[in-house]
Amino acid sequence: MLFLCLSTVFFIPSLSAEEPSEPIPLHILAVNDFHGQISPGQKINGTPVGSIPVLGAYLSNATETYGVNNTIIALPGDLTGASPAESNLLLDEPAILFFNRFVTGDWKKTDSTQSGGRVIATLGNHEFDRNVSELLRLINGGNGDTNITHLVDPYPGALWPVIAANVYWNGTENLVFAPYVIEHVNGIPVAFIGAVTQVTSEISEPEKVASVVFTDEADAINAQVQALQKEGIHAFVVLLHEGGTQTPYDGPTRETGDLSGRVASIVIRLDEDVDVVLSGHTHAFTNQFLPNAGGKPTLVTQAYSYSSAYADVSLALDTQSRDVVNSSATIITTYADQGPGQIPDTNAQELLDAVNTTVAPFTSQVIATTDIPLTRTPDENGEALLYNIVTDAFRWYMKTDMSILNIGSLRADIDAGEITTGEAYSVMPFHDQINIVQMTGQQILDLLNQQWTRTVKPDHLLQISGFTYSYDESREPQDRVIHITFEGKDLDMNKKYTVATTDFLISGGDGYTVMKEGDVIAYGALDVDEFIEYLKSIPSPIHQKTGGRIIRVGNQSEDAMTAG
């Protein structure tokens, strides 16, 4: 008996001394705010980026490098909506078909292959641009209400899970979508939970989202985490369509950073088991660890927008605890002339060619003509011709007193000659919603002065319609506007005026925080739709000129100003 006991004592340390298994790698390729940007045209520092042939090459190369069984493509919202013409006219189906290609191997196929990859998506606010029923069709499949030839007939829908833990049918406790999906990586379960920004109902047209309710993101995520913890799951990745801003840098995640914005206030409330938050919505760079509710570091990423980049997230999964024991990320820009971008994805190129052939008869429709180029270049006063026409369009369509738009909203000039629907979409690829905000004369004055006090692009002036103003750059930045005229009279500082502008500006975009002081009183259509309708309504050819709306003192007499 003594020998047996000694033998037992001898063998126990031997078992405990075995080398632990190596952690299992999981690589997540996160593409946020794609917005149907299937075509080339985007540039960073003058270098072409994005498009599905280029993005497809990057994602395919990364998947091949890491291994299909250890790679997941994640889409943290706004995959569709606010899309260019070629996507928009096809009801955003090309974006879905492109990512189906990573599951099926071919965008035309409608069933997954045994060796197919994995894709997971959550929703963004722009997924609700048309309405909830159309969103469900886009996800679940079935031909949409369009007379354009279908690329795949019948349209198959998304061949991958779409998750959202905080979207409920109005008046019920029923979720519209599955809140999470469990993916197994070498036998280790990893939970992916989705959530869309709670303010979706505030930044969408009310009738489009009347049937659903968006609840608090952190509460919804935590509820799912706690339920799944009871099932023994401890590795959690969140797809969150909400974001912030951070100073960009190259390379892997750094220990410190300056991330700010609404995403930070959400992460700090998340359960300590949440390992990664793949964010979106703000079209910005994010790559930082933030403390969660338990004080543990949560990796937070975001990779710009419009197919120009993706977040390459590397996780290490412990085989014993089945938890994430290491995490890091790098934001990869999808340069077309570098790395994988030099050999475009042939299957994605085939899809893009099919799209362009299909929509050509529609994008080539002539809506107006112009005798002169309509450019975005400001004159000596800071006034730009194309912006004058666009702000006139918004004021006309929304029937407001004024219209205000930030430089940078328009992304292409229009050459002399015929103006097509395709060109209109090129001018306005962001597809901002135009709303009416009510502001006092004092708030309008403060907003105009903020052009020189904000830290974002202080040399870019706002573009206007419906009023005139003069400014003097020799005065203090906060007091440069010296005169505002509306309908031939001085602007009344106490009176309220209606202003047509973008949802981007209303939210304080480009540093115009004064805009947030106004009251949104009505919601309109997308900018490009209003622009097209306006061009159809005015005489052609267009021969409008700049002058008289914005006057820099020293260039012209202020008396020369006329209402625009």
Enumerate the language-model features and the residues they cover.
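Classical eukaryotic N-terminal signal peptides for Sec-dependent ER targeting/secretion
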Residues: M1-F3
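N-terminal signal peptide
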Residues: S7-S21
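Acidic, metal/ion-coordinating pockets
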Residues: E18-Y335, N381-A393, T453-V456, H460, ...
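Non-catalytic terminal accessory segments
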Residues: A17-V31, H35, K43, T47-I52, ...
